[in-house]
């Protein structure tokens, strides 16, 4: 992740994604002298929003969180709606991919966004609803960046299966959280609604 050196590139690491928010707070609280340490908030967009909440659950220096179109990338089980045997098959496939990666001398990668942005929404290829939504932002000039093309090692999904960004969301309370969604049912799963309820009750 990021632009640091080392191989393999594009490893999706949920703990490091969350750590990035705390690292930003480190910087703001030590290097940005005009910043009040007691008034630092974070904003998480799309997949980053879940990790912003994960960071805030343990980093009390984060005084509030704003999420925009939050997407919990660690909730593979919920997103894929897999039966137990399908979940086992997925884990087995990903686990064995680690051997393949080692023997091939390089990791297998998820498909990525295009190398150049599309000119308009009409030019975008048609995929499933979730991929279409991503492409409408990240594959167009407004959201495209050459270093953020959605590529990750295939085995990164193992880390997403063993880490849950929202497990400790209730520990953020009483610090405020603002959830911004385009519409009322956009990716709000049961676990997310319970988290909101807990925060509002307590």
Question: Model-derived features: where do they sit?
Answer:
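Hydrophobic, aromatic-rich cap/lid helix
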Residues: 140-161
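Short beta-strand/loop motif that positions the catalytic acidic residue
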Residues: 172-173, 178-181
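Short beta-strand immediately N-terminal to the catalytic nucleophile in serine-hydrolase-like folds
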Residues: 41-44, 66-68
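Catalytic histidine neighborhood in serine/cysteine hydrolases
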Residues: 198-202
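Conserved alpha/beta-hydrolase "acid-adjacent" motif
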Residues: 164, 181, 185-192
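Gly/Ala-rich beta-loop-alpha elbow adjacent to hydrolase catalytic centers
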Residues: 44-48, 52
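Catalytic nucleophile-loop/oxyanion-hole region of alpha/beta-hydrolase
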Residues: 2-41
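Alpha/beta-hydrolase-fold enzymes
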Residues: 51-136
């Amino acid at each position: 992740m990021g632009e640091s050196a080392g191989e393999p590139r594009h490893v999706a690491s949920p703990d490091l994604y969350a750590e990035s928010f705390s690292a930003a707070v480190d910087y703001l609280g030590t290097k940005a002298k005009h910043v009040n340490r007691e008034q630092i908030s974070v904003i998480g967009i799309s997949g980053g929003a879940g990790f912003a909440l994960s960071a805030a659950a343990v980093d009390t220096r984060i005084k509030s969180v704003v999420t925009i179109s939050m997407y919990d990338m660690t909730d593979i089980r919920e997103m894929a709606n897999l039966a137990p045997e399908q979940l086992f098959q997925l884990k087995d496939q990903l686990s064995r991919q680690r051997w393949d990666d080692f023997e091939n001398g390089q990791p297998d990668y998820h498909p990525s966004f295009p190398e150049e942005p599309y000119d308009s929404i009409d030019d975008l290829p048609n995929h499933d609803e979730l991929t279409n939504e991503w492409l409408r932002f990240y594959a167009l000039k407004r959201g495209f960046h050459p270093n953020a093309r959605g590529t990750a090692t295939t085995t990164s999904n193992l880390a997403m299966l063993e880490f849950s960004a929202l497990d400790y969301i209730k520990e953020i309370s009483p610090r405020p959280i603002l959830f911004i969604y385009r519409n009322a049912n956009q990716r709000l799963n049961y676990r997310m609604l319970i988290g909101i309820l807990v925060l509002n009750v307590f």
